[in-house]
C-alpha cells in the first residue's frame, strides 16, 4: 500500500505528537496486545508479562525505536527495517499475523492518548503505515 504525501504528513505529525512518550506507548500497546490476544504471549515465555514489567517496558521501547526509525524513512521502509525483518523471520520466527495484532493495539493506544489528533484521516494514514511496516517485517519469511 503506497503512502500518499498526505499520509506521510499525517504519520509524521502524529508520531511527532507521541514525542517522548514513544517507549511508554510501545509498552502499553504490547500489554494491550497480550491482554486482548493471549496467544501472542507464547513468543515471550521468558518475560514477566505483568503490568509495568521492566521487560515489557524494555521491549516496548524497542518497538517504539523501530517505529521512530520507520517514520524517519518512509520512502525506504525495506532498507530501514531490513535487519529487524531478518531477526523476526529467521531467528524469532514470529507468526506474521502477530504484526497485525500489534498494529491494532498500537492504533488503539494512540487513539486513547491522542483523541483530538486521531482524526479519520490520521487513523487511515497510521493504519496504512503500520500495514506497510508489517509487510516489510514479513517480507523475508519466504
From Swiss-Prot:
Domain (Globin) ranges: 2-142
Q: Where are the transmembrane segments?
A: none
Q: Which residues, renumbered to this chain, carry the PTM Phosphoserine?
A: 4, 36, 50, 103, 125, 139
Q: Which residues carry this modification: N6-succinyllysine?
A: 8, 12, 17, 41
Q: What positions does the entry give for heme b binding?
A: 88
- Which residues are listed for O2 binding in this entry? 59
The PTM Phosphotyrosine maps to 25
UniProt GO MF annotations: haptoglobin binding; heme binding; iron ion binding; organic acid binding; oxygen binding; oxygen carrier activity; peroxidase activity
- Positions carrying N6-acetyllysine are 17
Keyword match Lipoprotein = no
Keyword Isomerase listed? The answer is no
Query: Where does it sit, as one GO cellular component term?
Result: haptoglobin-hemoglobin complex
Tell me which domain of life the UniProt entry assigns to the organism this sequence originates from. Eukaryota
Query: Per its UniProt record, what Pfam families does this chain match?
Result: Globin
Write out the GO biological process terms: hydrogen peroxide catabolic process
CDD domains in the record:
Hb-alpha-like (cd08927)
Q: In which tissues is it expressed?
A: Red blood cells.
> What protein family does this chain belong to?
Belongs to the globin family.
- Report the protein's function: Involved in oxygen transport from the lung to the various peripheral tissues.
Tell me the PANTHER family matching this sequence.
HEMOGLOBIN FAMILY MEMBER, HEMOGLOBIN SUBUNIT ALPHA
User: Subunit structure, per the record?
Assistant: Heterotetramer of two alpha chains and two beta chains.
Q: What's the protein called, per UniProt? A: Hemoglobin subunit alpha-I/II
What species was this sequence derived from? Bison bonasus
